[in-house]
A protein has these predicted regions:
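Structured alpha/beta reader/binder surfaces that contact nucleic acids or chromatin modification marks
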Residues: 1-119
């Protein structure tokens, strides 16, 4: 499985991005939860969607089971984990349409390097 980090490729590559929120279908959410439950924790990071001529730029390992979170519950501490592109939580919420009740899937991970231990 893969995730595209189109807006935050540099932050993914330098390891500072450790969380991403996605507006995924129930099916996609369940697939990621199943991967966690089955111990399939390593996945590919891409610079953009492969259908848009993206390329694989690295690998990452899930560090928590994917979960859903209301945008209004977005912790300020996650601004840096999301790549640091948004100065405030409200800026991030506005990017997502401004609805604090919108629910997104949260994926927490760490970027793997060639010598990263996979636990």
């Amino acid at each position: 499985m893969l995730i595209s980090f189109a807006w935050t490729t540099p932050q993914f590559l330098d390891g500072s991005k450790t969380a991403t929120r996605r507006d995924w279908s129930d099916l996609t959410f369940k697939q990621w939860c199943k991967a966690w439950d089955e111990g399939r924790l390593t996945h590919d990071g891409w610079d953009k969607n492969p259908r848009c001529k993206g390329k694989k730029v690295g690998r990452f390992m899930l560090t928590a089971r994917p979960y859903r979170e209301r945008l209004g519950d977005f912790p300020e501490s996650d601004l840096a984990a999301e790549g640091g592109l948004w100065p405030t939580v409200q800026d991030y919420i506005n990017l997502q349409g401004g609805d604090q009740d919108k629910v997104l899937v949260v994926i927490r991970f760490r970027k793997l390097t060639e010598d990263s231990p996979i636990e």
